[in-house]
Amino acid sequence: MEGEAGGTLMQEAWESIDAARNYKNELQERMIALELARNQIKESAAQTCHALRQHFVDLKTAITKLLDERQETLLQEVSAIEQENIKPLDDCQKLLEQGVNTADDLLKEGEMAVSGIAGNNENLYNFTNKALHNQLDSLPEVPSLVEVPCLSAQLDEIFLCVVRDHICKLGSVASRPPVQIEELIERPGAILVKWCKCDDDFVAQDYRLQYRKNTASHFEDVYVGSESEFIVLQIDPNVDYQFRVCARGDGRQEWSPWSVLQTSRTTLVPHEWSTGYDGYSLSSRRNIALRNDSVSHGVLYSKAATYLSGQTLTFRVETVGQMDKHDGIGVCVEQFDCESLQRDKAVCVSTSGAVYVNGKEMTNQLPPVSPGSTITFDMEIMTLGQTNNEGPSQKRRVTISSSNREVVFDWLLEQSCDSLYFGCSFVHPGWKVLVF
């Protein structure tokens, strides 16, 4: 009994030790998270202070420059008015000085004439004759003070009050950005970014999403629009990327502060079309297929069976050509050398919107395909049936969506499979399809 009791106590002791170790690890992880939170507050505060100081330094410089330019403009205007109106007065000044000089000369000559030898009428005659010719009764017009400019500066003293009001409302400090990244979901060769508003009072008109590799120094704009999610394509697998989002308020021009940086990666290899099909031309990343004008046509399949249950497979039709009833975009279990995906062990959507399951057309349809249309496939394995000669049967719940409409049905496969191929077939050229 004592041995059993001792063994029980030992077991309890080891369990307590494990619990204490796990508790310690959890606390240490929370301490790391707490330190990250502390650093975010301190670093964002320092960055905000630097941004505020730099903004106001730039603003002061710009305002001082504008005020100096305005002052110089007004001073030049004063100088121009002064010069323009002083010139006539200078001309009048010259006439007056000339008249004074003439009068002085006449005075001297007259005084000499009258103080000369008595009876010398010739000198008196010459003087009076000269005085008559000088028109001593003709005086130049001198403008009165009310007729000449009296310059002054009109300064609107309310301007300072208006500026003060604007300055008091200039800028703001927010403890949190109005929008944050909510979820990052890995997709094959892509990452789905979802964001949401954190401020109910903020009315967002547009959102702006940027991303970069962890090793890059600059962010790139990848989306600007009103949606609250976006799939970022051309993501290299197993490489960390950083994402951030901001918003623009209704009727505003400036963007809000950026959200907290979020890092994510995808471990899923990108979907690719197979090479070597004469009827199709592929992009460099082999995720875009263009039906060319080659006479050969048939189904273009994926490079491998990369579509897994539980994932979302999306086709975006970039350009369209002439429709044909045998056209189709969809998924299949196996690759067959055939003309269309409208066959057994395949599900597809025709360009007219008809849905085919194992070669049979369904009653429900989707809208016809048009430029920019997206067709998404979502599948979920429901049950595994009894085993037959080829293996256990499998039922999948399939949801196909396009243009805000969807078709839901169960797809029964005679044998189970972990992954599916995707494919497309177009009879006529001009169709271009992006897969992701």
Swiss-Prot record:
Residues 9-87 form a coiled coil. CDD domains: FN3. Its main location: cytoplasm. GO terms for cellular component: cytoplasm. Residues 177-270 form the Fibronectin type-III domain. It is found in: Cytoplasm. The keyword Cytoplasm applies. InterPro entries: FN3_dom, FN3_sf, Ig-like_fold. Disulfide bonds: none annotated. Keywords: Coiled coil, Cytoplasm. May play a role in the negative regulation of cell cycle progression. Belongs to the cytokine receptor-like factor 3 family. This is Cytokine receptor-like factor 3. It comes from Xenopus laevis (African clawed frog). The lineage of its organism: Eukaryota, Metazoa, Chordata, Craniata, Vertebrata. The gene is crlf3.
